[in-house]
Structures are given as C-alpha cells and as structure tokens.
Amino acid sequence: MIIVEHLEHYLGEIESGIKCLDRRYHLSVSVFPSQPYKGVTTFSTLGLNRYDLNYKSRFELIFTCSEEWNKENIAAFLSGVAEYLIDNRQPILRGEIIQLPRVIIEGSKMDALYVSAPFYFDDDFQVCYGEHYNIVFPLL
C-alpha cells in the first residue's frame, strides 16, 4: 500500500493501528511513537483517502500530541473528524479553523483545530503522489 509506505518513510514504522469499530466508515488510525521527537506521538488516519471530498486531492489527517494522551481517545476524535468530512464531502484546507462540538479529550481545553501543513516533518511528507490522485496530509 503506497500510503503506508509513505507514512513509514517519513514517520518510521507504525507501532500500532486502532480500528474505529463504532464508526460508519472503514477507517483506522496509525500510531507513530516518538515522532517528531521523544515524548510526542503522531497519529494518522488510514482510509479517509478512499472517499471523495469534492476536491482535486484526497486526504489523510495527521495529529501530533503528548504521548501521555490516551491513544484510543485520539483515534476516536480523529475518526470523528474524518466522518464529518466524509458525510459533508467537505475538504479540509490549510488555514481553516475547525470548531469542535466538545473538547478533544477530557481535561483539555482544546475545542478547535487549526489546519496547517505538517511543518514538524520533512517538506516532502505533505503530499503522497498517486497514480489516480494525490493524497495530502494536513496537520490538525
């Protein structure tokens, strides 16, 4: 799978995957510990790119946070954002602010997300060039 190869090239080997079984779409979330540095974990959706969001490219979401945050909660949050995008066929573009219906995780005050390029990582990470369409990796 070209997406997995792309992710592992820039983020290292996938430590684990979390399937979001309570969701309507076939999505999972990949976990990359100590990326981009020690004490931080990076998460990526897998499967969002199968859905047309009414844009020239397809998407997989990237989220980076403290390794202390609960992985299952982050996976549920990311799959929820992905479901919203799929349901509304809405692309997620750089510079947008996404207002959330609640905080990301219990104990956090974060209830909105800013969409940016994945600036923590190598510039070439932000796009995976495919045969039929490109996949972009916005950082939330």
What are these regions (language model features)?
Residues 1-140:
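Acidic, proline/glycine-rich low-complexity IDRs
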